[in-house]
């Protein structure tokens, strides 16, 4: 539950003011050059004050929104946690970019370096990955990046043969658990059963291993990943699990050592080492990785990227659908059954024909980005454009985009504060995919060794669409929220 709490949806901000295009940013000469507003404040005092605002007095959403209003700009300088007193090697200074146009610069690899900036200037100990620098921490200019990205993409390609079968098999178990809990208790909390389902599904599809070959891993592997993830991101995340000032004192004051999870992580490592031979040989023989590098990167893709991402995104999607009372369920059900006819007709091809289902998935990713913050470091001096001005960025400065605000850019998205299920339907709706950046790049982009876009960009949206379609082949209606399901009516 800690993982879910850390990624809880931010309050809805008011729309920012900007416009962008998936094409390279407009020539800076077309816009006025402006001195970048904002301040880092006095040494120690400024970063500490911003940290307390971010975590305590304001929260991330209000933190960025009030500064954008104060400076009358969607681009400005400020600080972001973690910082003083026990993060002496972390520079909290950032350039915030809060509109679609300025945010798009984060994906121009000629302008930015993505080395060691997954969660900002703070990097969790390499001990969490057995001392290996995994692919996410590499820039595209580093030779090993192409090998690791290629390994990830080929693993995903090969997994497509069993992806649908394993997904539906594990969903059968998941929904069986939910139905049983509802019949016994009148409602079912589904976060943990869903995480167990996700873990088992990913082990089988990505690593080619049935988690049940190890009863300990089948029972506890997903719990280990929850702890492993939490220890890495706690210093950067507002949790709300304990009252302030205890959260600041106990949770945001220091980095957590990998030793706290080393024993259980080693069990996961050994599980992959002993059972995922085909996948590991792919990494060793085709991409020239050592066996240790292949294991550590496979675990990162499985645990951090896939499991962590789905654990945040899918509850948002399920909660959005189960909590809707506008007639959306009836519309989705009608589309799914019209396209599929029967459950046996559900596949990648048929789900791609479900425009409304896909649009709901995309709109959930816009409304609740699973990764709220994205970072990149200026590779050189350059000019960054917002909707109404140009600013000078110096080499080495850290750019930070806060997606819950970026994805509510009123100059790009009509009525950005509203969840519109049909937003991406039709030709006009498809154009908006150019500005959907949840995957570290646009939804219309192509992941490759030359960029940092999520290798699973397309399979994530397909998987979510398959889950929704599967749901409405099973049930006529379903009632609940982002944490529990209260009732289901089976399909007639």
From Swiss-Prot:
Induction (record text): By wounding.
Keyword flag Iron: yes
Transit peptide residue numbers: 1-34
Annotated positions binding heme: 454
GO cellular-component term (any): chloroplast
EC number, UniProt record: 4.2.99.-
UniProt entry tagged with the keyword Transcription: no
One GO MF term attached to the UniProt entry: iron ion binding
Region annotated Disordered, chain positions: 1-33
Domain of life: Eukaryota
UniProt cross-references to Gene3D superfamilies, sorted A to Z: Cytochrome P450
Gene Ontology terms: biological process: green leaf volatile biosynthetic process
InterPro entries: Cyt_P450 (IPR001128), Cyt_P450_E_grp-IV (IPR002403), Cyt_P450_sf (IPR036396)
Organ and tissue specificity: Expressed in roots, leaves, flowers and siliques.
Keyword vocabulary terms for this entry: Chloroplast, Heme, Iron, Lyase, Metal-binding, Plastid, Transit peptide
CDD domains, A to Z: CYP74
Cofactor(s) annotated in UniProt: heme
Gene ablation phenotype (knockout): No visible phenotype under normal growth conditions, but plants lacking HPL1 cannot synthesize the green leaf volatiles (GLVs) hexanal and trans-2-hexenal.
Known function: Catalyzes the conversion of (9Z,11E,15Z)-(13S)-hydroperoxyoctadeca-9,11,15-trienoate to (9Z)-12-oxo-dodec-9-enoate and cis-3-hexenal. Possesses low activity toward (9Z,11E)-(13S)-13-hydroperoxyoctadeca-9,11-dienoate. Required for the synthesis of the green leaf volatiles (GLVs) hexanal and trans-2-hexenal.
PANTHER family: CYTOCHROME P450 26 (PTHR24286), INACTIVE LINOLENATE HYDROPEROXIDE LYASE-RELATED (PTHR24286:SF49)
Family according to the record: Belongs to the cytochrome P450 family.
Annotated protein name in UniProt: Linolenate hydroperoxide lyase, chloroplastic
């Amino acid at each position: 539950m800690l993982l879910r709490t850390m990624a809880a949806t931010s309050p809805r901000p008011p729309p920012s003011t900007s416009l962008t295009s998936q094409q390279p940013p407009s020539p800076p000469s077309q816009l006025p050059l402006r001195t970048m507003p904002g301040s880092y404040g006095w040494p120690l005092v400024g970063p500490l004050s911003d940290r307390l605002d971010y975590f305590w007095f304001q929260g991330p959403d209000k933190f960025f929104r009030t500064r954008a209003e104060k400076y009358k700009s969607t681009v400005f300088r400020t600080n972001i946690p973690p910082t003083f007193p026990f993060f002496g090697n972390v520079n909290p200074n950032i350039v915030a970019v809060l509109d679609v146009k300025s945010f798009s610069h984060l994906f121009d690899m000629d302008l930015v370096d993505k080395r060691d900036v997954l969660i900002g200037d703070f990097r969790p100990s390499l001990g969490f990955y057995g001392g290996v620098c995994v692919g996410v921490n590499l820039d595209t200019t580093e030779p090993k990046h192409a090998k690791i990205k290629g390994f990830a993409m080929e693993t995903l390609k090969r997994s497509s043969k069993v992806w649908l079968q394993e997904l539906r098999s594990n969903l059968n178990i998941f929904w069986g658990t939910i139905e049983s809990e509802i019949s016994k208790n009148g409602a079912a909390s589904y976060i943990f059963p869903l995480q167990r389902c996700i873990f088992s599904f990913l082990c089988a599809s990505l690593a080619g291993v049935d988690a049940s070959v190890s009863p300990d891993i089948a029972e506890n592997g997903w719990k280990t990943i929850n702890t492993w993830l939490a220890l890495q991101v706690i210093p950067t995340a507002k949790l709300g699990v304990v009252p302030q000032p205890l959260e600041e004192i106990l949770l945001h004051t220091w980095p957590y050592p990998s030793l706290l999870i080393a024993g259980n992580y080693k069990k996961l490592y050994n599980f992959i080492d002993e059972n995922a031979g085909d996948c590991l040989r792919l990494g060793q023989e085709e991409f020239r990785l050592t066996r240790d590098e292949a294991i550590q990167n496979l675990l990162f893709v499985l645990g951090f990227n896939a499991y962590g991402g789905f654990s945040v995104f899918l509850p948002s999607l399920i909660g959005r659908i189960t909590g809707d009372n506008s007639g959306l369920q009836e519309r989705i059900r009608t589309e799914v059954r019209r396209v599929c006819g029967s459950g046996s007709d559900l596949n990648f091809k048929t789900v791609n024909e479900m425009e409304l289902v896909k649009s709901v998935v995309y709109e959930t990713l816009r409304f609740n980005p699973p990764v709220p913050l994205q970072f990149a470091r200026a590779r050189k001096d350059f000019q960054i454009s917002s909707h109404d001005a140009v600013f000078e960025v110096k080499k080495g400065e850290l750019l930070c985009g806060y997606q819950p605000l970026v994805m509510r850019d009123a100059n790009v998205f009509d009525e950005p504060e509203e969840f519109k299920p049909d937003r991406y339907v039709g030709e006009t709706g498809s154009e908006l995919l150019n500005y959907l950046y949840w995957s570290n790049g646009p939804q219309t982009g192509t992941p490759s060794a030359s960029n940092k876009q999520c290798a699973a960009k397309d399979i994530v949206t397909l998987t979510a669409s398959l889950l929704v379609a599967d749901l409405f082949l099973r049930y006529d209606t379903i009632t609940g929220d982002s944490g529990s399901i209260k009732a289901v009516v089976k399909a007639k």
